[in-house]
Curated annotation (Swiss-Prot):
Residues 18-28 have a biased composition (Low complexity). Pfam families: Histone (PF00125). Residues 1-32 are annotated as: Disordered. Residues 1-17 have a biased composition (Basic residues). The nucleosome is a histone octamer containing two molecules each of H2A, H2B, H3 and H4 assembled in one H3-H4 heterotetramer and two H2A-H2B heterodimers. The octamer wraps approximately 147 bp of DNA. This is Histone H3-6. InterPro entries: Histone-fold, Histone_H2A/H2B/H3, Histone_H3/CENP-A. It is found in: Nucleus; Chromosome. The keyword Isomerase does not apply. The gene is H3-6. Transmembrane segments: none annotated. Core component of nucleosome. Nucleosomes wrap and compact DNA into chromatin, limiting DNA accessibility to the cellular machineries which require DNA as a template. Histones thereby play a central role in transcription regulation, DNA repair, DNA replication and chromosomal stability. DNA accessibility is regulated via a complex set of post-translational modifications of histones, also called histone code, and nucleosome remodeling. GO terms for molecular function: DNA binding; protein heterodimerization activity; structural constituent of chromatin.
Length: 114
């Protein structure tokens, strides 16, 4: 015995009931749904592989200009300066979420809270 899960036992009458129910409703098959958390884990893996910025550039640029306006009016930004700010902001947020996740795991929770 190699361990692991035992093979599932298929019950014939349950399968027959399902197929007859689909035939009774006119063959309308309900849409496929992944189990809760599966899509989230897939997205986590996808975003961890990628290096592109996740916040849209123009909304971030508007936010930077809005915040800078409070300190000095008529400021101009090089495009590289805004990109550097965005890289720093996203790196900070990723670190914050990593720490938040560790705190949630420590508290025996799965969901992170504000």
């Amino acid at each position: 015995n190699t361990g692991g899960k035992a093979p599932r036992k298929h019950i014939a009458h349950k399968q027959a009931k399902k197929s007859s129910a689909a035939a009774a409703t006119g063959g309308v098959k309900k849409p496929h749904r992944f189990r809760p958390g599966t899509v989230a884990l897939r997205e986590i893996r996808r975003f961890q592989k990628s290096t592109e910025l996740l916040i849209r550039k123009l909304p971030f640029q508007r936010l930077v200009r809005e915040i800078a306006q409070e300190y000095k009016s008529d400021l101009r930004f090089q495009s590289q300066a805004v990109l550097a700010l965005q890289e720093a902001a996203e790196a900070y947020m990723v670190g914050l979420f990593e720490d938040t996740n560790l705190c949630a795991i420590h508290a025996k929770r799965v969901t992170i809270m504000p």
